[in-house]
């Protein structure tokens, strides 16, 4: 679907947040989230609805020491004809390939980006020097950590949301090994293209002010499938009703974008949210004619964003009720 058509559908879907109705309760939102999650998104449900964090302020803290390698290392894998996993056990990094180069989505931590991304690409027979663009979903250390490495060593262009470029530049303690230089500031609906690979940016502020989600196409034995990639999920922003309004609006916006693009594959930058690690392992058992483990269907993709939105609405309502 053309960019203009997708944006038109998205705009119509998010023209305004709901007002509280007499029947609205915290429990009604939690039940709706649990129903939508089913057995597909239990990790997301547990993180957002069962024990969401209560954040009072965003702190510019220095990164902690690197954890033991066995807590994060995992071998890279070819997942689709043109998409490769070069992430860790907990955090994802994806390489979308084309005849003219690679688009890398997210870059893990500083401490593991060398081994998982650079080393992983080489293990898969891919050349890190062919990474033309690095798209950062949001400027937290578990996703932006390897951006400077890719920029400095391979000349990759770094794409990030404007507010997250701003926070990166203002950070005093968050980048002891250096920051990526401000490069491409992403716009809503922008396409990042290398050869026959293209990623459409959907700005989804909430998790951070500059969070980016994405729509792109992968191929499964030559069959094209559309991916909806969620760029930020957890409630690690200050717990205020206006902040949850922003988050909820973005979840609805991304749900509309995914539906407009007929996305049947869901991916996230945290493996707990899309079950990437077990799904990759299950590919070894896939028989001819069986659906791809990531190809969950359009309805399931939509249900993911129902989970995130309903959990957020429950938290928002708790805040409003606590003030009454």
Stretches with model-predicted labels:
Residues 23, 28-32, 111-115, 119-191, ...:
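Active-site HxH/HxHxD metal-binding segment of metal-dependent hydrolases
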Residues 69-124, 128, 213-235:
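Conserved beta-strand hairpin/beta-sheet module of binuclear metal-dependent hydrolase folds
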Residues 82, 96, 106, 138, ...:
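Divalent metal-coordination and catalytic microenvironments
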Residues 20-66, 221, 233-324:
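Accessory terminal helices/loops
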Residues 1-6:
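Bacterial N-terminal signal peptides that target proteins for export
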